[in-house]
Amino acid sequence: MAVGKINRRMWFRVLPLTLSVFLAQHEALAKGKEIRLAAAADLKFAMGELSEMFERRTGTKVNVTYGSSGNFFSQLQNGAPFDLFFSADIEYPRKLEAAGIAEPETLYEYAVGRIVIWTPAEAKVDVTKHGWETLLDTSVEKIAIANPEHAPYGRAAVAALQKAGIYESVQAKLVFGENIAQAAQFVQSGNAQAGIVALSLAVSPAMRDGKRWEIPAEMHPALEQGALVLKDAKNKDAALAFLEFVKSATARATLAKYGFEFPEKTKKEGRR
């Protein structure tokens, strides 16, 4: 057997053990502390579960603030007091890293998001059968999306509508949420009859009884999501421990449960 093949096999056996040891070391330092996390609104349910798991493992309290990635980016440039930033667009963390605001070598692409058209179960048009045509139906007077000026999921929605060739036809129907969670709330509350929202929200307990149609990933730029530890993090050890936890198999399984994909899969499929 070739030496190269043996070395590769040994590497894949050793790597999980190395990560486990590294995570254990960070978690030991994190015990009993508190971290402040700025998270994109598409993570509302997934991050809630991850935070609870981490708290049980380490005793570290995770205080999460949800919002739009673009707004957090502006706040962090002006010294907002967060330890970690989980963005729905990796370009924001990259810019923070380039500006020297991030802890060196902590930038991590943790997931790739997906978008769907979502309607309440009682909607007059069945989105699972009609897809894009749902948005053109006269029963749909308002379509909720996140504000594309500062929300990555809003930009993805606009790009997909343009790719589908219906943006001009539905532009007058669009209503903007401050972030993707607020856009979803507009549809849930009846203030819009349909919405283009994050799959991670559509599969949550609050929305899973509605109907959804997954927008093909090739119809919009990939929602590459990135995280990092801030250079001025008050509890850096705990922040690093949380970031390492997110890389674990347990955390990735939780993200997958909420519809998130991972960079290695999308690259393999040529969707990058």
Language model features with spans:
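Secretory targeting signals
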Residues: 1-5, 19-21
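N-terminal export leaders
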Residues: 6-12
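Bacterial N-terminal signal peptides
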Residues: 13-24
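Exported/periplasmic ABC-transporter solute-binding proteins
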Residues: 29-66, 70-80, 87-90, 94-103, ...
